[in-house]
């Protein structure tokens, strides 16, 4: 059985026996923005993506569940929507050919910033990056 069927995609708490969330009332029929990842997408064969929490010009943040660590976390996706778009079938980002150099430069900066943040584990008020990987022609950072 798919482990995501037991989890609410709004808060990543276990669903009740009636398959409803008694914590946040999220339902699977809530639409998501097509340019971003759909709930129940699995990243790196490890992280179940839930609803999108926020997005800006740099990317999007999603609540997610770590199937290995068995904990909730946040996935941050590099997705500058003015430079690329998502292929709806493959989930890969397709970069506008005129923007390829800019896309790669900004993605490198995104990765560099998150590498620095991952070394700041001792600071209480900074979300710690616990994992970073490339998939779908972009970079993802998992925050604790």
Protein language model regions, located:
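ATP-binding glycine-rich loop module of kinase domains
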Residues: 67-111, 115
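Protein kinase glycine-rich loop
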Residues: 50-56, 61
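Short cysteine-rich clusters marking metal-coordination/redox-active sites
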Residues: 8-11, 21-24
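Short beta-strand micro-motifs within the conserved protein kinase catalytic domain, predominantly
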Residues: 128-139
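Flexible N-lobe loop architecture of eukaryotic-like protein kinase catalytic domains
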Residues: 54, 121-125
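A short, low-complexity linker immediately N-terminal to eukaryotic Hanks-type protein kinase catalytic domains
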Residues: 30-49
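Short Cys/His-rich micro-motifs in 6-15 aa windows
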Residues: 15, 23-35
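Short pocket-lining segment of the protein kinase catalytic domain that shapes the ATP-binding cleft
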Residues: 141-144
């Amino acid at each position: 059985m798919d482990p995501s069927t037991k989890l609410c995609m709004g808060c990543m708490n276990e669903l009740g026996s009636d398959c409803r969330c008694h914590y946040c009332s999220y339902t699977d029929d809530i639409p998501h923005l097509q340019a971003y990842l759909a709930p129940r997408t699995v990243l790196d064969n490890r992280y179940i993506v839930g609803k999108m929490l926020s997005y800006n010009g740099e990317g999007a943040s999603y609540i997610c569940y770590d199937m290995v660590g068995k904990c909730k976390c946040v996935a941050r996706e590099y997705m500058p929507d003015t430079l690329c778009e998502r292929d709806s079938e493959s989930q890969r980002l397709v970069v506008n050919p005129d923007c390829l150099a800019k896309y790669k430069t900004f993605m490198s900066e995104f990765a560099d910033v998150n590498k620095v943040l991952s070394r700041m584990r001792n600071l209480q008020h900074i979300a710690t990056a616990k994992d970073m990987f490339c998939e779908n022609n972009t970079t993802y950072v998992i925050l604790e």
